[in-house]
Amino acid sequence: MARLKSLYNEELKQQIKEELGLANVMQVPKITKITLNMGVGGASQDKKLLEGAVADMTAIAGQKPVVTKARKSVAGFKIREEWPIGCKVTLRGEQMYEFLDRLIAIAIPRIRDFRGFSPKAFDGRGNYSLGIKEQIVFPEVDFDKIDRIRGMDVTITTSAQSDEEGRALLKAFGFPFK
């Protein structure tokens, strides 16, 4: 079992229940999924860029990403409908907790000039989104083998009903907020 999953089940559930003043342990919010998204701007001109992004995302997530395609044509961006423009992967269960553990313990401390995540990035329903500017903060990505520095979006979806519950959950996991 993943380290953070057992920690959540054995200690954090009770701690969050008391902190939020909930009556039942089943009301305690939990993380339902983590979605990683990488938009590849030049993928419409150069298909190799997308292959590099897929390789990086596979190494980071431990799961092959799905290629996202443009929903409609936009002349200003020089893209057409159905053209590949990025990749995304959704993590659930054990892989989700393993990724969250690596994100908190290894990747976040390697971010340059990091002062904590903004507490304002909650969406009103307890879900949190953050951006990572460089994929090289993850140790799985070999610095010598990358073709270019890419960023990614990480969305942590929780079962929380409010931002306050979501913040309490992520803080219990050790998320560094400002």
From Swiss-Prot:
One of its GO terms (molecular function) is rRNA binding. The keyword Plastid does not apply. The keyword Nuclease does not apply. It holds the Pfam family Ribosomal_L5_C. InterPro entries: Ribosomal_uL5, Ribosomal_uL5_bac-type, Ribosomal_uL5_C, Ribosomal_uL5_CS, Ribosomal_uL5_dom_sf, Ribosomal_uL5_N. Belongs to the universal ribosomal protein uL5 family. This is one of the proteins that bind and probably mediate the attachment of the 5S RNA into the large ribosomal subunit, where it forms part of the central protuberance. In the 70S ribosome it contacts protein S13 of the 30S subunit (bridge B1b), connecting the 2 subunits; this bridge is implicated in subunit movement. Contacts the P site tRNA; the 5S rRNA and some of its associated proteins might help stabilize positioning of ribosome-bound tRNAs. Part of the 50S ribosomal subunit; part of the 5S rRNA/L5/L18/L25 subcomplex. Contacts the 5S rRNA and the P site tRNA. Forms a bridge to the 30S subunit in the 70S ribosome. This is Large ribosomal subunit protein uL5. The lineage of its organism: Bacteria, Pseudomonadati, Pseudomonadota, Gammaproteobacteria, Moraxellales.
